Amino acid sequence: MASSRTDPETEPESVFPREIRLFTDSYSESSRFCFCGHELSITQNFGSRLGVAARVWDAALSLCDYFESQNVDFRGKKVIELGAGTGIVGILAALQGGDVTITDLPVALEQIQDNVHANVPPGGRARVCALSWGIDQHVFPGNYDLVLGADIVYLEPTFPLLLGTLRHLCGPHGTIYLASKMRAEHGAETFFRRLLPQHFHLELAQRDEDVNVNIYRARHREVAPAGQHPFC
């Protein structure tokens, strides 16, 4: 679904560099996680090819745990996950009844697809697509009920691209859930305190102190509940 026409200055590889030094050895590891009564088997393909997309990060686990503890209702909802990596968040949403599109850069899609096949039964509504922020988000509809992202706020040059993508994808009555490790050196505070509130009503839904992860909930300004104010 991704557009093949890109500006050389905005090629995904130039904006989302693979951190080849993070995983110099190539190997696969399968881990099991339990959320909402589902046992998920997630394969992580470590190596320089995938880099940070290879592993299940703390923010993804925190977001899955939040969905379980808050009994977030995915039934019949149109859902999209950004920067999915292993796909664990989108897979859980699909198992909980969502009609889910799981996205990342093309290099990560094979890993996601393998995990979808391993966890989502035939007939489950989970599709895997390439999506490069700021380049081809308009290939996707702009009426998602839920937009999900876990640990996708860590490269400041991508922030404007992510904002534009969120603004397009989130439907007028939709909700965005973003879980993020709050790394000061990666600009997370700037994104959530200054940039995102310019376009959305934002609230801190949960703070996981042990792993330094915040979970934020955002909605378009014009449809936010009465009396709600931007997070500051």
Swiss-Prot record:
E.C. designation(s): 2.1.1.-
One example GO MF annotation: methyltransferase activity
UniProt entry keywords in alphabetical sequence: Cytoplasm, Cytoskeleton, Methyltransferase, S-adenosyl-L-methionine, Transferase
Tree of life domain: Eukaryota
InterPro entries found in the cross-reference section: Methyltransf_16, SAM-dependent_MTases_sf
Root EC class: transferase
UniProt xrefs under Pfam families: Methyltransf_16
Biological processes annotated in GO: peptidyl-lysine methylation
GO cellular component, as recorded: centrosome; chromosome; cytoplasm; nucleoplasm; protein-containing complex
Location of this chain's protein in the cell: Cytoplasm; Cytoplasm, Cytoskeleton, Microtubule organizing center, Centrosome
Chemical reaction(s) catalysed: L-lysyl-[protein] + 3 S-adenosyl-L-methionine = N(6),N(6),N(6)-trimethyl-L-lysyl-[protein] + 3 S-adenosyl-L-homocysteine + 3 H(+); L-lysyl-[protein] + S-adenosyl-L-methionine = N(6)-methyl-L-lysyl-[protein] + S-adenosyl-L-homocysteine + H(+); N(6)-methyl-L-lysyl-[protein] + S-adenosyl-L-methionine = N(6),N(6)-dimethyl-L-lysyl-[protein] + S-adenosyl-L-homocysteine + H(+); N(6),N(6)-dimethyl-L-lysyl-[protein] + S-adenosyl-L-methionine = N(6),N(6),N(6)-trimethyl-L-lysyl-[protein] + S-adenosyl-L-homocysteine + H(+)
Residues binding S-adenosyl-L-methionine: W57, G83, A84, G85, D104, W133, A150
PANTHER family, alphabetized: EEF1A LYSINE METHYLTRANSFERASE 3, HEPATOCELLULAR CARCINOMA-ASSOCIATED ANTIGEN
Oligomer and partners: Interacts with members of the heat shock protein 70 and 90 families and of the TCP-1 chaperonin family, as well as with HSPD1, STIP1 and tubulin; at least some of these proteins may be methylation substrates.
Function: Protein-lysine methyltransferase that selectively mono-, di- and trimethylates 'Lys-165' of the translation elongation factors EEF1A1 and EEF1A2 in an aminoacyl-tRNA and GTP-dependent manner. EEF1A1 methylation by EEF1AKMT3 is dynamic as well as inducible by stress conditions, such as ER-stress, and plays a regulatory role on mRNA translation.
Similarity-based family: Belongs to the methyltransferase superfamily. METTL21 family.
Name of the featured protein: EEF1A lysine methyltransferase 3
Gene source species: Mus musculus (Mouse)
